């Protein structure tokens, strides 16, 4: 064994061994308990960033630990390879998205291998290959036949100059990112999957997910947004149709003083034909973004349509306004407004001078003061005719019943959740497998024409999708009749909704899934990824699993038992102000800093001498130029060091502050372990451990070893507090470094301890542990070694520490047998010189003894 720790030599050698031995390839084995450990698959952007490294290190630690417990562990990896960034990069680099993507995959695959992640590479998938997306296309056609897929018009961002649809992120301040033309909202036909048909089950089954973070479950509950209310029908004077609104507060119905409809509602459109102000407003709304965050903060505007609706219970006429806070996509595109008891309605009514009628009493039974704001709390009704005096529930039921009796109201359960629009007017995605015949009939692509292959050898102009630009591509025939293919592609969330299941059978050619393999491995035991995926990906992931279950492919109801959301990786951020007042962000690697005595940064400059402004720690990002390249760190310190720092610096679900001093600390620790093993093995063969022959000190050290094994096992396995597990191993290492190494049993004990330490560190630092295990004479590869088991006998305390006080002041501590009597403890205390001097020439008047803990001698 060489004296110096040289990661660059060890790591490549061990990685080659894993590759040649195919160490992490697994197959179904009914005789073993399975464990499926999955990290969210990466987008092949070109380089790994520290967020990836953190995510995949956590996954690898869990997978290696479970493997050492003797389980059959599947840990696969693949590439979420379709998506918009590839189109932008292709235009910029004058290439096509496919070669750019495949080059990135090759580069990043090598980076993953360099970090020593134990993946089953035989199961690698790239979602942009026809071998993968053909099954997604087939499944979509089956969902269509089941009535779970439909087409309807929906609003998109449209650039009139480029004549193209833009993704939300391509709209900058309301303008096209390429040509700066003002973006319009345009209605185009798009494909949808009926996720709403599963809303109740998606909501209900959240209760089964005991090992998912509550924050994620709450976000999904709110996103699905189940509510119980009443759908009410209003007649409108001079308008051919009725208006239907939904409310969760029918108790406030007698306070409804106006209705509001979306600018896109047929009533508003009709009224706008003879109303220039309204027509201009409808036009303005058409080009407004409808992201929910913006809806909440934007100014509420409206125009009176001139129509009057009839209140179904009072017969009063109430105005109908067009308002920008009502969306056609949500509900019926019309809402009833009760300004006395809803803050948004109150602000709108105050702005436009509409009637505000209170119908709920304040908590103290008085009429509410509505001079400043609405009263939104529930309470007792007044000003409501026959319903006066009723509290919320009674009023809800009485008014709902009355409306139903008159045929103008119906109790309804509503959801905020909207059906999933899966059409994208982009090129780099899986083609949607639908065709339109000459007579307008829409059909799913026949099975013998699947997969519909996306051509990869294309020229990108950055404006129009190559498959839309090439009229020949869309031409096909069905039953000998000409037809046109759909030129939209799938939302890339489609691919990431079922990849986890395909990993169980990536070579299977008979269908989407091999049920036998899928049901052996599924559900996923732990799924690791960022909380930013809480509603979109993680909801579609759950939805797709239920679709596959209902198609008879899987038997479980949910795709993953446990979800672990890792925290973000933060780094210092610095900038200097340029000549034009712009901020120039400087990489923390290039910042020369001065710190105060507490280690805080007080001054910074860069190599060019610019005074830098330090903005604190923030998420590593391109925009702040504060990303640290994992590759540079691996080259400098080795993969094991980077992995150890990642797992030690912070709990897995909390933010991690990147500090190179911490990386250096992790590196020093690995060197200490190496040095101790080197010194130990250099002394030659070791005798067998004879537990019965150990001295008290040796027993105490062995107790520490086995208590550490018990703690680390609990920290990694049950608590998943990986940082405290590492801290416990470090603490034990400090004791081992100080332990005597001369006697035969000293060395035998150190041998047992080091073999335990190396196995406990193996999930975190697998390369160095692989090597040290061999040096310590471990059996076989450490990858197949069992996890150390704590010896219960060794952990039994046969002595205990008793604090000795004289007149209530601590004067010493003594070690006594666990079963020592009070007399024996007193006798032992008298022999302790620190205590004895306080007992010299005095009389012990009283003895207070707390067995095994405290002896207090009262003297006078």
UniProtKB/Swiss-Prot annotation:
Signal peptide: none annotated. It is an enzyme of class 6 (ligase). GO terms for biological process: leucyl-tRNA aminoacylation. Keywords: Aminoacyl-tRNA synthetase, ATP-binding, Cytoplasm, Ligase, Nucleotide-binding, Protein biosynthesis. GO terms for molecular function: aminoacyl-tRNA deacylase activity; ATP binding; leucine-tRNA ligase activity. A motif ('KMSKS' region) lies at residues 619-623. It catalyses: tRNA(Leu) + L-leucine + ATP = L-leucyl-tRNA(Leu) + AMP + diphosphate. Its main location: cytoplasm. One of its GO terms (cellular component) is cytosol. InterPro entries: aa-tRNA-synth_I_CS, aa-tRNA-synth_Ia, Leu-tRNA-ligase, Leu_tRNA-synth_edit, M/V/L/I-tRNA-synth_anticd-bd, Methionyl/Leucyl_tRNA_Synth, Rossmann-like_a/b/a_fold, tRNAsynth_Ia_anticodon-bd. A motif ('HIGH' region) lies at residues 42-52. The keyword Ligase applies. Transmembrane segments: none annotated. SUPFAM superfamilies: Anticodon-binding domain of a subclass of class I aminoacyl-tRNA synthetases, Nucleotidylyl transferase, ValRS/IleRS/LeuRS editing domain. The keyword Ligase applies. ATP binds at residue 622. It is found in: Cytoplasm. Its EC number is 6.1.1.4. Gene3D superfamilies: 2.20.28.290, 3.10.20.590, HUPs, Isoleucyl-tRNA Synthetase, Domain 1, Valyl/Leucyl/Isoleucyl-tRNA synthetase, editing domain. Belongs to the class-I aminoacyl-tRNA synthetase family. NCBIfam families: leuS_bact. PANTHER family: LEUCINE--TRNA LIGASE, MITOCHONDRIAL, LEUCYL-TRNA SYNTHETASE. This is Leucine--tRNA ligase. It comes from Salmonella paratyphi A (strain AKU_12601). The gene is leuS.
């Amino acid at each position: 064994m060489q004296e110096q720790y040289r990661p660059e030599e060890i790591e490549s050698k061990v990685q080659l061994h894993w590759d040649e031995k195919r160490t992490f390839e697994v197959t179904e084995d009914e005789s073993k308990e399975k464990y499926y450990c999955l990290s969210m698959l990466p987008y092949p952007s070109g380089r790994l960033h520290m967020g990836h490294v953190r995510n995949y290190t956590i996954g690898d630690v869990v997978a290696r630990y479970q493997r050492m417990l003797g389980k059959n562990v599947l840990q696969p990896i693949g590439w979420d390879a379709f998506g918009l960034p590839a189109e932008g990069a292709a235009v910029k680099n004058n290439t096509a998205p496919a070669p750019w993507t495949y080059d990135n995959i090759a580069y990043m695959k090598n980076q993953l291998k360099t970090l020593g992640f134990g993946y089953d590479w035989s199961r690698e998938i790239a979602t942009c290959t026809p071998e993968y997306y053909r099954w997604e296309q087939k499944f979509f056609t089956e969902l269509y036949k089941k009535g779970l897929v439909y087409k309807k018009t929906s609003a998109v961002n449209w650039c009139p100059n480029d004549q193209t649809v833009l993704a939300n992120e391509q709209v900058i301040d309301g303008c096209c990112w390429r040509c700066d033309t003002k973006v319009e909202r345009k209605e185009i036909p798009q494909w949808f999957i009926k996720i709403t048909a599963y809303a109740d089950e998606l909501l209900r089954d959240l209760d089964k997910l005991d090992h998912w973070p509550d924050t994620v479950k709450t976000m999904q509950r709110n996103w699905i947004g189940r509510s119980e209310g009443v759908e009410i029908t209003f007649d409108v004077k001079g308008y051919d149709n009725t208006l239907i609104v939904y409310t969760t507060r029918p108790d406030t119905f007698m306070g409804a003083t106006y209705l509001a409809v979306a600018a896109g509602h047929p009533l508003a459109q009709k009224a706008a034909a003879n109303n220039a102000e309204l027509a201009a407003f409808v036009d303005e709304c058409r080009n407004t973004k409808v992201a929910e965050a913006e809806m909440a903060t934007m100014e509420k505007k409206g125009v009176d349509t001139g129509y009057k609706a009839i209140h179904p219970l009072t017969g009063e006429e109430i105005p109908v306004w067009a308002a920008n806070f009502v969306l056609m996509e949500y509900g019926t595109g019309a809402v009833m407004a009760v300004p006395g008891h809803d803050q948004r309605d109150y602000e709108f009514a105050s702005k436009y001078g509409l009637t505000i009628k209170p119908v709920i009493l304040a908590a103290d039974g008085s009429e509410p003061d509505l001079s400043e704001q609405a009263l939104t709390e529930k309470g007792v009704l007044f000003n409501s005719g026959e319903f006066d005096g009723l509290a919320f529930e009674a009023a809800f039921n009485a008014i709902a019943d009355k409306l139903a009796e008159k045929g103008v109201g119906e109790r309804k359960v509503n959801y905020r959740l909207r059906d999933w629009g899966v059409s994208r007017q982009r090129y780099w995605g899986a083609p949607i497998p639908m065709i339109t015949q000459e007579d307008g009939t829409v059909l799913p692509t026949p099975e013998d024409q699947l997969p519909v292959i996306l051509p990869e050898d294309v020229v990108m102009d950055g404006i129009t999708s190559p498959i839309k630009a090439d009229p020949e591509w869309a031409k096909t025939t069905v039953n000998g009749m000409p037809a046109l293919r759909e030129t939209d592609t799938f939302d890339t969330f489609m691919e990431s909704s079922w990849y986890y299941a395909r990993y169980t059978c990536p070579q299977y050619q008979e269908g989407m899934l091999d049920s036998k393999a899928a049901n052996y491995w599924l559900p996923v035991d732990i799924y690791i990824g960022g909380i930013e995926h809480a509603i979109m990906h993680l909801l579609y992931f759950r939805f797709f699993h239920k679709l596959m279950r209902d198609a008879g492919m899987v038997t479980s109801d949910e795709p993953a038992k446990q979800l672990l959301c890792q925290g973000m990786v933060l780094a210092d951020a610095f900038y200097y102000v340029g000549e034009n007042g712009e901020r120039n962000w400087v990489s923390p690697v290039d910042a020369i800093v001065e710190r105060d005595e507490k280690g805080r940064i007080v001054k910074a400059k860069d190599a060019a001498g610019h005074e830098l402004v330090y903005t604190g720690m923030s998420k590593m990002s391109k925009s702040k130029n504060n990303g640290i390249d994992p590759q540079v760190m691996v080259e400098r310190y080795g993969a094991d060091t980077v992995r150890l720092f990642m797992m030690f610096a912070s709990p897995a679900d909390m933010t991690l502050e990147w500090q190179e001093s911490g990386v250096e600390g992790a590196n020093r620790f690995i060197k200490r372990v190496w040095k101790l093993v080197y010194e130990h093995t250099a002394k030659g063969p070791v005798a067998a451990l004879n537990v019965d022959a150990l001295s008290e000190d040796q027993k105490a050290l062995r107790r520490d070893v086995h208590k550490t094994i018990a703690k680390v096992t609990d920290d990694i396995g049950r608590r998943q507090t990986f940082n405290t597990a590492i801290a416990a191993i470090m603490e034990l290492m400090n004791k081992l470094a100080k332990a005597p190494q001369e006697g035969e049993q000293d060395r035998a004990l150190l041998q047992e301890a080091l073999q335990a330490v190396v196995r406990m560190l193996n999930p975190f630092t697998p390369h160095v542990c692989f090597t040290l295990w061999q040096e310590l004479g471990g059996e076989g590869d450490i990858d197949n070694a069992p996890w150390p088991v704590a010896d219960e006998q060794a952990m039994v305390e046969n002595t205990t520490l008793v604090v000795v006080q004289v007149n209530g002041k601590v004067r010493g501590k003594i070690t006594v047998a666990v079963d020592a009597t009070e007399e024996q403890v007193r006798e032992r205390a008298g022999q302790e010189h620190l205590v004895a001097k306080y007992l010299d020439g005095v009389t012990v008047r009283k003895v207070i003894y707390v067995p095994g803990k405290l002896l207090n001698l009262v003297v006078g």
